[in-house]
């Protein structure tokens, strides 16, 4: 894929902060990290039904080396990751070496979501529970990051799709 190991997602100062934060549990029972976007390519279709992207560089799934450092640091803190900016509500369990060996993320969409995105992998997910939709389960995103789709609020492709009710606006 397009990994550039020397490219930075988080700087050294940010990674040092996360390392110290992970070790300090003073007056804390739970930790959550807030950021602009999730650490994977969380959508395949952009803008309209035919707008498939292989990999979205507007996500924190790239560079993969930096992504793995970031979620590795958050994993040490047992932190839940809460983010936005993917225009699509999702819950992912991220993986570094194996599927589901790192953090969970919850991405919320905009309240008035005018730019549609869908999670619609070409291959069915692996290791799904019986009866689960084929879009769920273990996948590789466009950057070959290991992600497990737990929940996705794809917009409904129906007539009158310009209405906010069909855009999964505010679903999360």
Locations of regions flagged by a protein language model:
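Long, structured stretches of catalytic cores involved in phosphate-ester chemistry, encompassing
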Residues: 1-172
